[in-house]
Regions:
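Hinge/lid segment of periplasmic solute-binding proteins
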Residues: 2-50, 64, 103, 113, ...
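Short helix-initiation/N-cap motifs at beta->coil->alpha
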Residues: 69-74, 153-167
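Paired acidic/hydrophobic, glycine-rich loop segments that form the ligand-binding mouth/hinge
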Residues: 1, 171-176
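Short, solvent-exposed loop/beta-turn-alpha elements that line the ligand-binding surface or hinge
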Residues: 16-28, 84, 96-99, 115-137, ...
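A local structural motif
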Residues: 62-64, 143-157, 169, 187-193
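Extracytoplasmic/periplasmic solute-binding protein
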Residues: 35-44, 49, 73-125, 170
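Glycine-centered hinge/linker elements that transmit conformational signals in sensory
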Residues: 76-78, 123-155
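C-terminal lobe and pocket-closing loops
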Residues: 178-190, 202-267
Length: 267
């Protein structure tokens, strides 16, 4: 669930604080957050959204990794293959649904443009002229990118974002590291033909990686004490094994993991 779901449970008194476990380690940016002075969530990864692209197709067309919105759009257009007016290979695929895939993966180019959504008092300021202009131009970009997508896609969720790239139906997609696992398992011929890049802004000044956290919560039950004991045992003994179970998808948010020999020895 989202942070709002966790906060609802915390405010309702249904969660056990995990502050004593969280404070034992250093965390990446925005990794460990508190509500009412306590940690209610033990993170284990960033779900970073990167843009996957076909390196072999880039080489064929002499394309470079884009540094601006315009360059990204031109690359998508250049790699779109049409026959008799129909798109046979899309230049890209993007989320198109009122769901968590859209919330998670769509907005890298907008975040790179750095509009302000709220002021320091949580008032909505996205409609201020400068912010509205950035958001409007992003929507225009999205509309142009849509024209390079395979036809007939009225909704696009997690499944399509992965499957269309893995099967070679599109040249770009937005996803986390699970794409790599899917390529190696389902289409190994493409497993050495992909690359990744961060979402650029419109002027080439900066890039962004949208992300979402995964982690653990502990609910209050008749076995609350045992629940926390189990969580501590799991963190001490199997936390890294858990991360290795989806090694490309689970980018650790706990900073000490990157120096841990158990993490490094993964083949």
């Amino acid at each position: 669930g989202y942070i709002a779901h966790i906060l609802q449970y915390a405010r309702g008194g249904h969660l056990l604080p995990v502050t004593d476990l969280v404070k034992q380690h250093s965390w990446g940016q925005m990794g460990a957050w508190k509500y009412q002075g306590e940690n209610w969530f033990y993170p284990y990864d960033y779900n970073l959204v990167t843009c996957y692209y076909r390196k072999d197709l880039y080489a064929e067309k002499g394309l470079k990794i884009p540094n601006t919105w315009a360059e990204y759009l031109e690359n998508c257009r250049a790699l779109t293959v049409s026959k008799d007016g129909n798109i046979e290979r899309g230049g890209c695929v993007m989320p198109l649904a009122s769901d968590s895939a859209t919330n998670w993966a769509s907005f890298g180019n907008l975040f790179a443009e750095a509009p302000q959504f709220y002021d320091d008092k949580w008032n909505v300021v996205l409609d201020a002229p400068e912010n509205a202009d950035r958001a409007g131009r992003f929507l225009d970009l999205y509309g142009e990118l849509y024209k390079t997508m395979p036809p007939g896609l009225n909704t696009v969720g997690y499944a399509e974002l992965m499957s269309l790239f893995v099967t070679g139906k599109v040249a770009h997609t937005l996803y986390s590291g699970r794409v790599v696992e899917a390529l190696e398992a389902r289409n190994p011929d493409l497993a050495d033909k992909y690359g990744i890049f961060a979402a650029p802004d419109s002027t080439g000044k900066q890039k962004a990686l949208p992300f979402a956290f995964d982690g653990f919560v502990a609910f209050k039950t008749k076995q609350s004490e045992e629940t926390l004991k189990f969580l501590k045992w799991f963190i001490d003994e199997h936390y890294i094994d858990w991360l290795h179970s989806a090694w490309m998808n689970s980018q650790p948010v706990r900073l000490d993991i990157y120096e841990d020999p158990r993490w490094k020895k993964h083949p």
